[in-house]
Amino acid sequence: MTSLDYVHGYTEDEATRLADQAGTLADLLHHDTQYPEGSRVLEAGCGVGAQTRILARRSPSARFVSVDLSAQSLALAREAIEREGLSNVEFKLADLHALPFPESSLDHVFLCFVLEHLPRPEQALRALLRVLRPGGSLTVIEGDHGSAFFHPRSLRASRAIECLNQAQAAAGGDSLIGRRLYPLLQSLGLDDVRVSPRFVYADKSRPRWVDGFTRKTFIAMVEGAAEPALRLGLIDRTAWDAGIADLKRTAEDDGTFCYTFFKATARRP
């Protein structure tokens, strides 16, 4: 994946969205992610460090090496780690298909919201497994935009989401990859493959989720796909704006929103 392939873009708004998303989802996605003292953990595709901060705080005695293909994103990640006073993270500019680490040199591998942007996720996983020691753990977290359902129902809102899916597919990605994690990891011959769905539900009685997920994570993500969706001719501006307006209705007092993430773990034989 190159910077041009990231459908959400590398804007300041996207960096803010990623940070908001990570904070909102921290407990849901990471309550069972901890690494032992002294272990070396590779975070592949760390981006702006939104997940890095959570990992480093939750496993302060582990050593993280976080890699990304974007120097711009790595600079933001370093700033975020320094602001929080964390000292157990090292950043490297690297392509996860050609990692600068010896074979079997790392104890654990973690990646979150990365495979969805890659045209050949199996190939990327094989490259990651090369540097993972036998018996070491692999953790993969992905969403699945096909799992989004909401009230009030709206074909226009669903069309806007589908435009994001199509734009991501045009860039070589798969926004529905969450449902594929189990067969994907199984096909690589890994041991102890397990997938845990992580369900989000937001309504007026759960204002933190309405604001943090419905508005600042999901709707903001779809809004960020306007440029590629319009450029590719997937939709016109009037229909796009109507879809976004209907999506925003789901965050009002009578609205509801549901979504499922998938967290997969496995071990290298």
Where do the PLM segments sit?
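A short glycine-rich, Lys/Arg-flanked "PGG" loop and its adjoining helix->strand segment in the class I
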Residues: 122-137
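Conserved alpha-helix/loop element of class I SAM-dependent methyltransferases that forms part
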Residues: 20-39, 54
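A short acidic, Gly/Pro-enriched loop at the edge of an enzyme's catalytic core
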Residues: 97-108
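Class I SAM-dependent methyltransferase Rossmann-like catalytic core
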Residues: 3-23
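Class I SAM-dependent methyltransferase SAM/SAH-binding core
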Residues: 42, 48-98
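A short SAM/SAH-binding and catalytic strip from SAM-dependent methyltransferases
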Residues: 107-121
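Conserved catalytic/acceptor-binding region of the Class I
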Residues: 139-208, 216
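C-terminal helical/coil "lid" or tail adjacent to the Rossmann-like core of SAM-dependent
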Residues: 7, 194-257
